[in-house]
Amino acid sequence: YRGIQDAKAAIRFFRKTYEMGNPYGVDTSRIILCGQGTGGWIATCLNSVDKLSEIQLPKFLDAVTAIPLIDTTLFGDWFGYGGNPMLNIENHKGYSSDHDMILNMGGAIGDLSWLEAGDKPMVAAHCNTDRVAVFGTGNLSTLGVQIVSDISGSYDVMHKADSLGNNDMIPMLFDDYTIAAQNNFASLISAGAVDADSNAITNSVSNLFPLITGNPAEGAPWDYFDSLTTVAIAMMQGLPAAQGAAAYSGSLNTNPDVSIAKATAYQDTVLSFFCPRIVNGLMLPGNTVGITNANKGISVNVYPNPATDFVSFNSSTNINTITIFDNSGKLIKNINPNRFTYTIDVSDFAKGIYHAEISNGITTKTEKFIIE
């Protein structure tokens, strides 16, 4: 919670410095938060927490007294405003805390219900073997003690974000890193893989790169650490050298093949997956969104959506072709209707998200539909 407050205060700080000559070169119209580990939690939760009721769900109440664990009258609200001045200092008040996009590396959300339609677009990378921020939905525990029940990692978060339409501005992509992510999903699904809470991985999810490292409990392959540094940090904190050595040894349990080469390779992979989605999601120069939607003359209604048995396409112009892909980019069906309205039997389609490219022979429009 304090991390959410601090992140919002940081956004306000950069907006404030923009008026002071912009020493940090910030484009205040395009602010993205990227976090890994705890930072991923902060970014994902910051994107969704906007109601008092969300931080006062039953699981966030004291089990004995039913008093909220987060008392905004003491600690301030999620913007960092209000509360007891002895416990919360308001920073850079008067500037916007708004952001434009979230990038999450191995983080999770306190409760999936926080995520709602209209939240900012999100992209994620996550190991299905992560034991702290579970890939799907499970309990947050440390040292065997459950802290919070039913937290949700990137697999469930991104599925819901996509289903709500929050990522609609990110088109289907077919670059090498997107294909690699799809192949990883295919490998996990075919192997009957589960996450650290034994949730089955049954479908691929757009805008999520599932990282497969081969280590059974790994959650942060982009990390690098060495014994000399961890010992030095421990001693700087007034702790015995042995405690730093123990921290190093403990980290090897989940990342036994740690190296700079490995860490930077995973960092490069994650950024190469993120960056095209940043460009398209924020409509930066070089985006590909306009390629399929450049001509606004073609208008298509897709209904019902979600669907179970059939999907109809009603176009403002003659439909030459309809090409349907599943959410992994696999070609499912290609049709040549040569009419303005066409209905497709989808009763044999697997449940999930699909993308239809509708062409009138001159322009193409892509529409998303869901099979339940």
Regions found by a protein language model. Give the residues of each.
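Catalytic active-site module of serine/aspartate enzymes centered on a nucleophile-bearing elbow/loop
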Residues: 231-287
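Mobile cap/lid helix-loop segments that gate and shape the active-site cleft of serine hydrolases
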Residues: 48-114, 120, 134-152
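Loop/turn elements at helix/coil->beta-strand transitions in domains of secreted/extracellular proteins
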Residues: 27-31, 40, 97-102, 118-122, ...
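Active-site-adjacent alpha-helix of alpha/beta-hydrolase-fold enzymes
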Residues: 120-226
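C-terminal outer-membrane/trafficking sorting elements
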Residues: 294-372
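Glycine-rich nucleophile elbow surrounding the catalytic serine of serine-hydrolase chemistry
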Residues: 35-45
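Gly/Ser-rich "nucleophile elbow"/oxyanion-hole loop immediately N-terminal to the catalytic nucleophile
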Residues: 1-5, 9-37, 52-57
